Amino acid sequence: GLKTREVAQLLGIDQALISKFESGTRKPTREQVIKLASLLEIDLETIMVAWLKEKILYEIGHDEFALKALLVAEQEIRYLSKPANKKLSTTLQKILDEIDVLKTKLDSFRKFDSFRIAQALELEYTFESNRIEGNTMTLRETDLVINEGLTISGKSMREHLEVINHHEAIAYIKDLMQKNMPINERELLTVHNLILRGIHPEDAGHYRKVQVMIQGSSHKPPQPFLVTKEMEDYFIWYETNKLSLHPIVLAAEMHERLVTIHPFIDGNGRTSRLVMNLILLQHGYIIANIKGDYDSRMHYYRTLETAQTKNNKEDFLLFIAQIEKESLERYLVIP
């Protein structure tokens, strides 16, 4: 092996410093660690992890709040290391191009009266979004509750409220869209309040104060004391990326990021889908309606799980883009 003097010469530093590195009285800089790894043929990741660990212990090792601070830092590092996928895959880019061709057709089509069509699509959206969450109302029953004010025998009060609330939440996001209001914390909490109104009055429009688990998923949402900070980061991320990303990618990212934080006791899925659709509507697209049948639901959950646990959003972005493309195609062929 190399002698201390030789290592010092090769690194271009004083020999006494090497001795201090060895004894632990001095810490090498990042650049010195990288040079050492190369010189001593040590795996860079191994030595960097060891160096960072020592750095953390030196700074906070003896502090009584160290563990809690580390938990907060871990969540934040995870969040910040999930960059928006700015370099899009060829497959995704191809679908986005096809969507934009359809959107151009839609823009000329909109000159005709499309109120009746929009109404039909919104009804289907309420039906499907609630069906994903286990609501057993049929499309016809959903229509009767919304448009005729009927009560369906054999269906629970909660199921009726889910239909009415979702319908009102759509009206609210359309109002935001018409006023050109950006999504922010106040508007998000209002949307959530509408979704859970009369169902969980004490939780409607409030972040959760307890830990939650997502049934059937290995993703563990952040601890309740981290939720407020994660949501601050969520809106900062939106403001930072809203002008640089394709609107479909932006909408899908905001959907995935919100459902991953899971900031509410209940209603996370419906609220995340409404946020996504608000962004789509604001950019002149139409509601992306994820179906609630078993196969569609499982596909949706699978792509979300991959984004959450493997930090790979490609499948989820493709899934949302495909849904929007199908929604546009359907809208354009309705007579």
Residues covered by each model-derived region:
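Generic structural marker for isolated residues within well-ordered, non-membrane alpha-helices
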Residues: 4, 33, 276
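DNA major-groove recognition helix of helix-turn-helix/homeodomain DNA-binding modules
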Residues: 29-46
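Short alpha-helical DNA-recognition segment
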Residues: 2-20
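FIC/Doc superfamily catalytic core
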Residues: 54-63, 74-335
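Short amphipathic recognition helices of helix-turn-helix/homeodomain-type DNA-binding modules
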Residues: 43-67
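Short, conserved catalytic or interaction motifs in soluble domains
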Residues: 23
